[in-house]
């Protein structure tokens, strides 16, 4: 008898943003296969005896290849087990959920997709940036700044895709990405923001114009989301989230920085 695999989106970082359906299937799973960006606290929802498989990918470290992950999901499903594949954000937004679903479908293993809150909308929201706003932004596009294998994305054909651009996986190429967007036609003076570790106590927001970010020496650690467009200008008025985590050794709360000014 075949089991079932749940492809569950874990949300952008705060474990409380997991959906009720996601929590429900986690609490009765036999196996949880989790990514690096899935909040570690969510593993505590799984039964104590559940198998936990680390499938995380980080710079210079890959616990399991995508092919190995697919094999684990198919193998456990064929054994009749309930499996949760726990992914940061949403499984179908740059999460390779489609690849895993195809592998399961091809093997005849039942699966269910449990959507999650994607950083593509949550990161801007936690920085006080609406991706659409009447009179400012009638459209938004979500783009990966980095392709498979770490190759840079071709931003020339996507730079004008929408009023608001949301670029995921941009942390390690921030200056290059901003420079490419300007070269592709985005206004150098357009408001832009980088949101790192969105929704967590370590959240950091850096604001400026595209040109300022392109010329700055600011560094952010992944996961980070770059947002650019007219509605980013609302961040100063709509900022609502106050991270509580202190900067190591300073006792100062992590906050928002402007690349041309001091912390607010």
Where on the chain are the PLM-derived regions?
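Short beta-strand/turn micro-motifs composed of small residues
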Residues: 34, 87, 115, 144, ...
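Short, glycine/charged-enriched secondary-structure capping and boundary segments
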Residues: 21-23, 46-49, 68-69, 98-102, ...
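A contiguous loop/helix-start segment that scaffolds small-molecule binding in enzyme catalytic cores
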Residues: 2-5, 78-83, 96, 139, ...
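Class I SAM-dependent methyltransferase SAM-binding "motif I" and its flanking Rossmann-like core
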Residues: 14, 88-161, 204-207, 253, ...
């Amino acid at each position: 008898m075949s089991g079932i695999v749940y492809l569950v989106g874990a949300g952008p970082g705060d474990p409380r943003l997991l959906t009720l359906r996601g929590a429900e299937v986690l609490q009765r799973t036999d196996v949880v296969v989790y990514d690096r960006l899935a909040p570690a606290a969510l593993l505590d929802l799984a039964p104590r005896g559940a198998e936990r498989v680390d499938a995380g990918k980080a710079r210079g470290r890959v616990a399991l290849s995508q092919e190995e992950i697919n094999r684990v999901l198919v193998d456990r499903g064929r054994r009749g087990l309930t499996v949760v594949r726990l992914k940061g954000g949403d499984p179908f937004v740059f999460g390779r959920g489609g690849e895993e679903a195809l592998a399961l479908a091809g093997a005849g293993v039942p699966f269910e997709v449990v959507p999650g809150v994607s950083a593509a909308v949550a990161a801007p929201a936690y920085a006080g940036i609406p991706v659409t706003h009447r009179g400012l932004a009638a459209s938004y596009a979500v783009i990966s700044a980095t392709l498979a294998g770490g190759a840079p994305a071709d931003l020339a054909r996507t730079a004008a895709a929408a009023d608001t651009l949301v670029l995921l996986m941009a942390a390690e190429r921030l200056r290059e990405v901003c420079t490419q967007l300007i070269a592709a036609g985005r206004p150098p003076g357009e408001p832009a923001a980088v949101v790192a570790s969105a929704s967590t106590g370590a959240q950091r927001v850096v604001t400026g114009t595209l040109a300022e970010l392109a010329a700055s020496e600011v560094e952010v650690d992944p996961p980070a989301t770059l947002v650019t467009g007219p509605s980013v200008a609302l961040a100063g008025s709509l900022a609502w989230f106050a991270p509580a985590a202190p900067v190591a050794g300073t006792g100062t709360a992590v906050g928002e920085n402007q690349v041309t000014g001091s912390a607010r």
